Amino acid sequence: MSRAAPRRASQSQSTRPARGLRRPPGAQEVGQRKRPGKTQKARQAQEATKSRPATRSDVAPAGRSTRARRTRQVVDVGTRGASFVFRHRTGNAVILVLMLVAATQLFFLQVSHAAGLRAQAAGQLKVTDVQPAARGSIVDRNNDRLAFTIEARALTFQPKRIRRQLEEARKKTSAAPDPQQRLRDIAQEVAGKLNNKPDAAAVLKKLQSDETFVYLARAVDPAVASAICAKYPEVGAERQDLRQYPGGSLAANVVGGIDWDGHGLLGLEDSLDAVLAGTDGSVTYDRGSDGVVIPGSYRNRHKAVHGSTVVLTLDNDIQFYVQQQVQQAKNLSGAHNVSAVVLDAKTGEVLAMANDNTFDPSQDIGRQGDKQLGNPAVSSPFEPGSVNKIVAASAVIEHGLSSPDEVLQVPGSIQMGGVTVHDAWEHGVMPYTTTGVFGKSSNVGTLMLSQRVGPERYYDMLRKFGLGQRTGVGLPGESAGLVPPIDQWSGSTFANLPIGQGLSMTLLQMTGMYQAIANDGVRVPPRIIKATVAPDGSRTEEPRPDDIRVVSAQTAQTVRQMLRAVVQRDPMGYQQGTGPTAGVPGYQMAGKTGTAQQINPGCGCYFDDVYWITFAGIATADNPRYVIGIMLDNPARNSDGAPGHSAAPLFHNIAGWLMQRENVPLSPDPGPPLVLQAT
């Protein structure tokens, strides 16, 4: 038995610990880590595992079951630990990335883009209202209005947005109006309130368009616009002041017109836009998200400065009559164009400046392409013909090279500068006086006298008369015309200039030449702006241009008397001038006819049958008050429709009417008969 006991003991050592003092339940050796107890869920799982029938994989070989189980537990614990560490690190990385993104965005918001965002935020609150300045008026010398402004509205609409809103409202409730019917109702309302201008069809077409913004109508009375918008809130109203031209086409070539946004487009409306338009005012304030103005936020108040009134030298009555006469002359003569200018003989002020076929600025200018939109009197130079002979007449008298009664033996042609120049009619040698040379408008006699003057003095006289240079009248688009510099003259140049060929001038320049003779030899450059009147009523007169002495007073008086010969009548014809139809009974009238061949652009040569027909005259020769210049572009007949090619009848009509209008007394002395041809 003593041998058997030790053997059992050795066998038991392999399966349980050696005998010794038993530890109480829950006791732990010093230095030994306490293993965490299993949770209830873990114990339940373990019991469930034990209760399951053993499978092949659960059955471990004898002696290895405990070690394998422990090995699997260690592996499972390691795997679960590695997975936890991975998830933990991944989560930290994601959080770090999000923090970096947030920090970057915060940097951009608070540092990099801070100023712009602050401005944008302020802009969403800030509102600036513009207070339009009233455009100044344009009036004549008597303060009769040619152009003025009244307050008006433009009806606006946003087709795409409004239609979308109407369709969405219709989808939500059947009580909402049918979108297409609503548009038709709006079109009918607008057309009805505006007297069918535009008509309903035109309005509906705009309402149904694919545009984002359209104007339904312009120049609408504010009360009418308010009524339409109140009934149909979909329609907006925008302030667009209406420019009124009470005379229609009266002086439209001078006054001009404006475009749809109220700025100058043509004429003085364009060139004086800064003076007439004024400066808009404005006020800035803040508005909350509900659209209500934030109290106390008003700032940056700038009061509107209204435009100034421009006072012209024109006389509406004279302008109206001359414009009528010009249109009538065009119709009767068959001319392509007709223009006329009336100047005050003493001051050079423009009293009338008229063209035919003038546009109406109160209507849509864009639809008046067949009308005369420009101002040919200042912008379209032409060769004047014999009207230019006043230069030779003035020079020869001023330099004492001839006298009015000197008799010249004038042949039918003359050789000069390598060219042969003829008179307009065939004749042999004629005993014309110097007065008769100009009264009969002899080209040959004029060149004979011009040879006495010489090129240098003749050129100097051209410049004194203001040719080849702008007048500075104050109108846009003015042409200087053309006078060849003397150093570019060829041999034939001096054979052409004295008879009005080879140079060009505007109608205003031509009329200004005769103003110098009417004003005792002093040329006052013409002007059309008399004064400006500020909104506060203060008036600023336009400075009078400097006077230019052209010839002496005595020379001017002599030339005026010589030019009476042009309108002189003689039943026999010997002492009759070229423009007797210009005369006005009871008054001494003086003037000069002109005919000039037009240039054929195809060959650079002159047409044989296309002419400029001109006339310039003084009313009256003994007491000058008015200077009148007229131009007809290639007429088929006289300005009164009679056979011939003369503008003298138009001068007669205008001058005679002026004498009656102003109650000018008859000339006390009709003047002695002038000798044109010696007998």
Swiss-Prot record:
Biased composition regions of type Polar residues, renumbered to the chain: 42-54
Active site: 386 (acyl-ester intermediate)
Transmembrane helix in keyword set: yes
Annotated stretches, region: Disordered: 1-74
GO molecular function: penicillin binding
Membrane topology reported for the UniProt record: Single-pass membrane protein
Role noted for this protein: Synthesis of cross-linked peptidoglycan from the lipid intermediates.
Family in the record: Belongs to the transpeptidase family.
Protein name, per record: Penicillin-binding protein PbpB
Biological source species: Mycobacterium tuberculosis (strain ATCC 25618 / H37Rv)
Phylogenetic lineage: Bacteria, Bacillati, Actinomycetota, Actinomycetes, Mycobacteriales
Annotated gene: pbpB
